[in-house]
Amino acid sequence: MLWPLPLFLLCAGSLAQDLEFQLVAPESVTVEEGLCVHVPCSVFYPSIKLTLGPVTGSWLRKGVSLHEDSPVATSDPRQLVQKATQGRFQLLGDPQKHDCSLFIRDAQKNDTGMYFFRVVREPFVRYSYKKSQLSLHVTSLSRTPDIIIPGTLEAGYPSNLTCSVPWACEQGTPPTFSWMSTALTSLSSRTTDSSVLTFTPQPQDHGTKLTCLVTFSGAGVTVERTIQLNVTRKSGQMRELVLVAVGEATVKLLILGLCLVFLIVMFCRRKTTKLSVHMGCENPIKRQEAITSYNHCLSPTASDAVTPGCSIHRLISRTPRCTAILRIQDPYRRTHLRNRAVSTLRFPWISWEGSLRSTQRSKCTKLCSPVKNLCPLWLPVDNSCIPLIPEWVMLLCVSLTLS
């Protein structure tokens, strides 16, 4: 038969509790968000023979109600924990063995605060170590991923680029890797703390930026690292590129030259064949000299030695065709008209078809006759009217004399 303990013994035991209940743990712990931290802890409590139940422990946040609020971590499987810390805060130690170590993963900024440990051993031991509280500080994640490039990036040759976060917590939620670049067309594979990208660079990728993003979903934070690609070319590739560039430039220049020639030809065809009006009708003196020279050429006694232009007029009066006249008067189209008969042309004051007979030779001389309306005359060539400046006619008739 067990007798109840005297009341004064129970009171004396309660006074000695503070001396026997002790907790050894760091006062302050700092961790970056998304990472993990291990808080070592040792707990001591009195050994009472009458308490036969198992020892359980819990970590609670400062200011909570012991009877209404749940702990952030506990070793009691029957007790619920807070949803905000469920799966992230874990009581690793066994309070039965005086170990109250706490493990925190996927740390979040709202985890910052004060925490205390509580031990329970039914039916008599229930103690909260509020005098030895833990201060937890969660700061922003300052670390960035590492991008490793093996050797040199050569254009046209695949390379494996590795993005890693060796400082990440293995016990935490695996991070998510993603690559960003205008040159990416390849696939990537990843492990717990790294991602390998199979990348085949091209010459145009030189100088572009490649970014690796790492997202820690457990904490809702993302970090990144950006590098600039340095793509090299082999000598053979360089020669090929130079040849291709030169070939393209040559083709473009050739096309441009052909276009210019075409435009020049079209411009010359449509341009009215004129000589600058510095002689002829606007110069009465030279016009009179030309008329006098022309009349002298018509004289039977005229000599070519005295008047060189007479050979042209006599050629006009003797030849059955006026092709020689066309060769002189149309310097821009003389090549085109060199072998063409007069039958394809129409003059407003002379009308003929085919070769000129001897009875029509005198009509050829009318072309150079000084008339009242000599300025201007119109010459239809291929159904197009070309205005003849009087100087042109003068030059036709007495070209050698005026030159």
From Swiss-Prot:
SMART domains membership: IG (SM00409)
A GO term, aspect molecular function: carbohydrate binding
Residue ranges occupied by any Ig-like C2-type domain in the UniProt entry: 145-228
Localization of this protein: Cell membrane
Name this protein carries in UniProt: Myeloid cell surface antigen CD33
Keyword list, A-Z: Cell adhesion, Cell membrane, Disulfide bond, Glycoprotein, Immunoglobulin domain, Lectin, Membrane, Signal, Transmembrane, Transmembrane helix
Disulfide bonds: C36-C169, C41-C100, C163-C212
Subunit structure: Homodimer; disulfide-linked. Interacts with PTPN6/SHP-1 and PTPN11/SHP-2 upon phosphorylation. Interacts with C1QA (via C-terminus); this interaction activates CD33 inhibitory motifs.
Signal peptide: 1-16
Organism of derivation: Mus musculus
Top-level taxon: Eukaryota
